[in-house]
Swiss-Prot record:
Pfam families: DUF494 (PF04361). This is Protein Smg homolog. Belongs to the Smg family. It comes from Xanthomonas campestris pv. campestris (strain ATCC 33913 / DSM 3586 / NCPPB 528 / LMG 568 / P 25). The lineage of its organism: Bacteria, Pseudomonadati, Pseudomonadota, Gammaproteobacteria, Lysobacterales. It comes from the Bacteria. Signal peptide: none annotated.
């Protein structure tokens, strides 16, 4: 049995959300599909809560990118996100893939996962899901999606 929130989220993203973003599915049919795929109802519920929290934090319009101070990580964030993860977030922000608000949303959603540590691949999926849910982030999402599925990363222009 698959038992992590991230596993449920990745399954949803790969099998439902990325296939046809315009197709609306009700929660019950999604839950039934997830149960048939082997996920526990408890983890499915946590994944839906995670998605609900992401949707609640979605801005109504895209905000302009503003350079700001460097993010200082603390306690639990340092424990959960290793130096590669933190460096990747800095890279994304410096290259304007993420703005400061999106970075904070990525951090919030990463910290909400019930895992002690996230590796870089896990964090990339969180970034991809956050960008998927952001208005005006289509180019950033497309770039990030390319990075996820290419053997050699594409340079940022």
């Amino acid at each position: 049995m698959k038992e992590s929130i991230l596993d449920v989220l990745l399954y949803l993203f790969e099998h439902y959300f990325s296939e046809d973003a315009d197709l609306v599915r009700d929660r019950d049919s999604l839950q039934n599909g997830l149960i048939q795929a082997g996920f526990s109802p408890a983890e499915i519920s946590k994944a839906f809560d995670w998605l609900d929290a992401l949707a609640e934090q979605r801005p109504s319009v895209a905000r302009p990118h503003v350079d700001g101070p460097v993010r200082i990580y603390h306690g639990p964030e340092l424990d959960k996100l290793d130096v590669d993860c933190r460096g990747f977030l800095l890279f994304l922000e410096q290259h304007r893939i993420l703005d400061a608000d999106q970075r904070e949303l990525v951090l919030d959603r990463a910290m909400a996962l019930d895992q002690d540590e996230l590796d870089l691949d896990d964090l990339k999926w969180v970034v991809l899901m956050v960008l998927f849910n952001q208005p005006g982030a289509e180019a950033a999402y497309a770039w990030m999606e390319t990075q996820m599925f290419l053997d050699e990363p594409e340079p940022v222009h």
